[in-house]
C-alpha cells in the first residue's frame, strides 16, 4: 500500500485501518468479530468494530485524540512511561474486556493471580506473586509489608515508622536512583554504603532490608548474589528492582532463584501488559503482608496503588504471552521492519548501521536500529531527522521530549533529541539517526519509511 504524506488525520486513520484490518480484534476474530465468514460465537471484538456504537459525545467522531486536541504518537522510543509505555496485544485487550464482565473479590483474585504468576514464572517453593499498580507501587507495598508485617496498628501508622522495630534500608550509593523515592515514601530511612565491608557494618537491629537496583548492578561493588548472602546471614530481607530488565524472560525466575526475597518487574514495558501494572514475586508471607498494605484495604499506604480486576486479568495474559514468546522470531520481525526503512531511504545515500543489541544487557534489552547520512548527499543531521519525525502531524513519530529532559517531567517542551541519543542511548553521531522498532504496530514501519522519504526529498529540493 502506498501511503502518501499529504498528512491529514482522516486519511491517516483510514490508512491505519486498512493496514491493520482486524488487528485489534481478539485472536482468531476478524474485524467483524467472527471466525471467518460464519461463527456461532457472538463475542464482540475489543477494538476494530466497536462493542457499542458511539454516536454522541466523546468518541462519536472515531478520533478520540482529535476530540481532546492531543497528538498521538508512533512509538519509536520504546516502553517509556512518559509516552504511555507499550502497546498491548489483542489477546490482552480481550482479557481486559472479559475481566470487566463480573465483579469479584479483589483479594481472592489477587491470591489466585499470585499462584498463576508463581507457576508461570517457575518461582521457588514458598514464593508467590502479586499484581501491583506498576513496579513503583510494588516497591511501596513491598517495603511497607516488610516493616508492618500483619500488624494493623503499624499499617495505619505508616509512613510514621518512628516506633517500628525495623525501619532502615541499606542501599549501595551507586544504586541510588529516582525510584528510591518509593522506599522513602514508606518512611524507611536509606543507609548508603559502598563496599561489602560497609554493608555488613551498616546492619543493625533497625535494619529491615537491603535494596538492590538491578539495572545499576554493574556500578556497585556488591553483586546481587553477595547481597543476598549477606542479608541471609543477618536475617534481613532483600528487594531487587528489575522493572525494565526483561527480556530475557528467564530473569523472571532467575532473580528469585538467586534468593531475593522480593523482585519486581514492570507489567507495562516489554511484558506489554496494562501500563499501570507491575509484577511482584516474593516469599508468600511477604506478599501477604504487601497485599494487606494495598488496595482494596482501607487506611493503608497502598490504597492509592489500586489495581482493578481488568488490569489483573490483562497483566496475567500479557505475562503468559511473554513467557511463551519466541524472542528470536520477534527479533526477525524487527529486522524486517528495519529493512523496509532501509529499502526506502537507500536512494538518498542513507545506509544502515549494524544493529545494536546486547541480549545480556542489564535493562531495556531491545535492539536499536540506526542509519548513516552521507553529508555530501544530504544537508541534514541525524538529530534534525528525529526532530522532523517528532514534528510530523497529525500523528507524531517519536516522543517529542521523552528522550530529552522531558523524560523526568522537568521540561515537557524539550526538543525530541539530546546530546546523548535519547533514552539510554550512546552519544549521538551527527550524521546518523536511529530508533527502536519493537513497539510499532503493523504498517507503521511503512509510515515511517514514507515520512523519511518525504523529509529527504524536501532536503534535496531546498
Residue ranges and their predicted role:
Residues 103, 217, 245, 441-442:
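Short strand->helix junction
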Amino acid at each position: 500500500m502506498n501511503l502518501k504524506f499529504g498528512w491529514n488525520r482522516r486519511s491517516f486513520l483510514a490508512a491505519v485501518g486498512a493496514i491493520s484490518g482486524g488487528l485489534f480484534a481478539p485472536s482468531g476474530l476478524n474485524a467483524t468479530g467472527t471466525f471467518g465468514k460464519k461463527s456461532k460465537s457472538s463475542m464482540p471484538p475489543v477494538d476494530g468494530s466497536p462493542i457499542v456504537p458511539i454516536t454522541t459525545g466523546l468518541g462519536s467522531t472515531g478520533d478520540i485524540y482529535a476530540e481532546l486536541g492531543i497528538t498521538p504518537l508512533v512509538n519509536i522510543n520504546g516502553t517509556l512511561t512518559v509516552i504511555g509505555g507499550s502497546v498491548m496485544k489483542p489477546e490482552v485487550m480481550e482479557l481486559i474486556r472479559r475481566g470487566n464482565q463480573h465483579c469479584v473479590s479483589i483479594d481472592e483474585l489477587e491470591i489466585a493471580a499470585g499462584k498463576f504468576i508463581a507457576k508461570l514464572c517457575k518461582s521457588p517453593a514458598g514464593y508467590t506473586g502479586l499484581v501491583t499498580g506498576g513496579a513503583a507501587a510494588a516497591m511501596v507495598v513491598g517495603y511497607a509489608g516488610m516493616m508492618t508485617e500483619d500488624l494493623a496498628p503499624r499499617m495505619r501508622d505508616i509512613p510514621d515508622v518512628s516506633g517500628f522495630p525495623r525501619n532502615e534500608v541499606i542501599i549501595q550509593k551507586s544504586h541510588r536512583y529516582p525510584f528510591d523515592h518509593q522506599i522513602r515514601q514508606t518512611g524507611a530511612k536509606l543507609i548508603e554504603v559502598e563496599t561489602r565491608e560497609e554493608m555488613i557494618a551498616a546492619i543493625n537491629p533497625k535494619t529491615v532490608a537491603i535494596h538492590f537496583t538491578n539495572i545499576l548492578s554493574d556500578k556497585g561493588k556488591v553483586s546481587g548474589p553477595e547481597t543476598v548472602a549477606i542479608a541471609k546471614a543477618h536475617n534481613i530481607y532483600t528487594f531487587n528492582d528489575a522493572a525494565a530488565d526483561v527480556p530475557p524472560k528467564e530473569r523472571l525466575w532467575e532473580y528469585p532463584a538467586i534468593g531475593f526475597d522480593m523482585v519486581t518487574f514492570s507489567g507495562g514495558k516489554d511484558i506489554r501488559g496494562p501500563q499501570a501494572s507491575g509484577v511482584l514475586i516474593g516469599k508468600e508471607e511477604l506478599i501477604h503482608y504487601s497485599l494487606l498494605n494495598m488496595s482494596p484495604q482501607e487506611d493503608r499506604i497502598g490504597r492509592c496503588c489500586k489495581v482493578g480486576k481488568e488490569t489483573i486479568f490483562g497483566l496475567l495474559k500479557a505475562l503468559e504471552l511473554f513467557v511463551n514468546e519466541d524472542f528470536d522470531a520477534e527479533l526477525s520481525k524487527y529486522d524486517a521492519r528495519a529493512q523496509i526503512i532501509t529499502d526506502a531511504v537507500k536512494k538518498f545515500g542513507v545506509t544502515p548501521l549494524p544493529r545494536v543489541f546486547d541480549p545480556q544487557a542489564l535493562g531495556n534489552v531491545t535492539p536499536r536500529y540506526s542509519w548513516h547520512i552521507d553529508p555530501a548527499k544530504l544537508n541534514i543531521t541525524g538529530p534534525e531527522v528525529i526532530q522532523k519525525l517528532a514534528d510530523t502531524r497529525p500523528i507524531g513519530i517519536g516522543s517529542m521530549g521523552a528522550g530529552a529532559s522531558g523524560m523526568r517531567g522537568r521540561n515537557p517542551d524539550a526538543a525530541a533529541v539530546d546530546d546523548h541519543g535519547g533514552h539510554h542511548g550512546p552519544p549521538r553521531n551527527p550524521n546518523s539517526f536511529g530508533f527502536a522498532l519493537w513497539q510499532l504496530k503493523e504498517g507503521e514501519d511503512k509510515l515511517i519509511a514514507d515520512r523519511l522519504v518525504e523529509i529527504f526529498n524536501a532536503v534535496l529540493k531546498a
